[in-house]
């Protein structure tokens, strides 16, 4: 049986250090972004909830979350740690759209500045290219 959140833990404790050791990356929160689409968007939200001191730029794409009693507390951890960008993209016909609305309401409820980029269409590559082209221009400003 695997450990819950093992992938997210590996991403933060193994992959980020590997990149910063082997590439010309600046090893600090203000120089790190995380983005993912679909399940990767779920990993993005989970990584920032579990490790709020690691990434300043948070961009989950085409993913939804479920509301839970712990969600506000988890988002408050991100708010307390600080972040520079919380940008969420999802198509209004995407099956993940209802979960994106949950995230939007939770971020609003917790007083967290964020952008919800609602595009036409569903869970399709065209939208992901649009999101990447849009949010990438906002990184590291």
Where does each model-flagged region fall?
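Non-catalytic cap/lid and distal C-terminal segments of serine-dependent acyl enzymes
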Residues: 1-141
